[in-house]
Amino acid sequence: IYICFMNHKEIDSKLNQGLQLPIMESFYTIQGEGFYKGSAAFFIRIAGCDVGCHWCDVKESWDSDLHPICSIDQIVENAKKYSNMVVITGGEPLMWNMNPLTRLLKQHNIRVHIETSGSNKLTGYWDWICLSPKKRKNPINEIYSKADELKIIIFNKHDLKYAEEQAKKVSKKCILYLQPEWEKRDEMMPIIVEYVMKNSKWKISLQTHKYQNIP
């Protein structure tokens, strides 16, 4: 439980500076998706999202006002108890200034990853950037060249065309993933498998933590 004695003006100032952040939850678990699947990591889910996908599985993260404000010192003190790898996710973490938090994490020799839609300016010091673009609000151009992996959620077959459009914008080193939307996985997986077999630059990303009932 975090108790704050500052007034709203002071809180807003620290939020704008990235010295405090709205945190929906944080937890130590196994990364279930993408290149680092199977790796232990401490997840920090930052509240607030300006994209709002209808199939989002953490819609409760969208409204930052519903979640406690935490200082980055508190966040890092908690994270360093668990792992030398932190994954910052949301919501959409780039709605906030990520420079102070990521700088402090790296001062403690913690590897820092982000999962983002890329809808806002890229801030922060990152060891790995997972870019997961959304049709509702496309990434800003500057982030494409920085992405280490591109993850496209496939809700219907038309998303494959969107995936190809997005793949043209990232660098050659970027790893390309197609991931079925969880509720549509049985319907979409055969389509994705066939597509990847015909277009081998793509890999399949599965939410393995859900298959294995890992939180």
Regions found by a protein language model. Name each.
Residues I30-G32:
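Short, P/G- and charge-enriched loop/turn segments at secondary-structure junctions
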Residues H8-I11, N16-Y28, A40-F43, A47-W126:
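Conserved Radical SAM active-site core
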